[in-house]
């Protein structure tokens, strides 16, 4: 039985999480659309293109130690060759000797390109921890 579009999108997001959690950021570029945009929290800037977006993971992982990361199942809506997914997460990390605990939602837009679902847009929205 072939995977549904939602299952394929879920697998693409799981692949992204696995890559950054394992520090394998070199593999992330292949998961991103060539014109990908990551909008910074609060819409306070943006990273454009694969190289710049992968660098956001590299910078975070170089500067911090992730102590805990949990995410919920994503909510996925598919419209032809476009999908919108939201993913709730909670994380604790140390940066510069200071601990932070945060929670929020990642919002992704994915496009089907050559039979693969690629991340084309992402932002993060902070939310209170549960």
Language-model features: locations:
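ATP/adenylate-binding site constellation spanning eukaryotic-like Ser/Thr protein kinases
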Residues: 33
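A beta-strand edge to alpha-helix "cap/lid" segment located at domain peripheries
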Residues: 1-27, 37-130
